[in-house]
């Protein structure tokens, strides 16, 4: 079941209260199972300092990929990366190569010249290195 939050100014909230009526509520809003799972996940993230390491891990991806000649640019926020190739035709071929290697990725709906990397926050450095090795193997085949 999903867990979400809605944060708003009083002005916007009062509008959504009436038009549509209760337009700010969710189907599972406040469901105890969702809240318990969300609380446990937050506790794990805090106790294990997972978020504190996200920037370093994202930088590692960037460092290991940036020097490949097929990579034109890397845009990144933490562990959310867009790797720009500059040409849609190259990216379409790359996605097919990714599938052959068991890599799950795709282009962005708004940008068909870049592929996404969005690993779990708990990814290890060794897993990042293995992932980048596979990505580079595919890039080399373009």
Q: What are the residue ranges of the model-derived segments?
A:
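Conserved N-terminal phosphate-binding loop of PLP-dependent enzymes in the Aspartate aminotransferase
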Residues: 1-142
């Amino acid at each position: 079941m999903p867990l979400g939050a809605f944060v708003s100014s009083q002005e916007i909230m009062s509008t959504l209260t009436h038009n549509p009526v209760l337009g700010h509520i969710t189907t599972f809003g406040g469901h105890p199972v969702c809240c318990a799972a969300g609380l446990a996940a937050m506790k794990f993230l805090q106790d294990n300092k997972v978020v504190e390491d996200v920037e370093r891990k994202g930088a590692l991806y960037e460092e290991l990929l940036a020097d490949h000649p097929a990579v034109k640019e890397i845009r990144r926020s933490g562990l959310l990366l867009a790797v720009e190739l500059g040409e849609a035709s190259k990216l379409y071929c790359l996605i097919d190569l990714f599938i052959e290697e068991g890599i799950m990725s795709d282009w962005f709906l708004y940008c068909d010249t870049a592929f996404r990397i969005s690993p779990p926050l708990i990814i290890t450095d060794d897993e990042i290195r293995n992932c980048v090795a596979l990505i580079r193997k595919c890039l080399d085949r373009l």
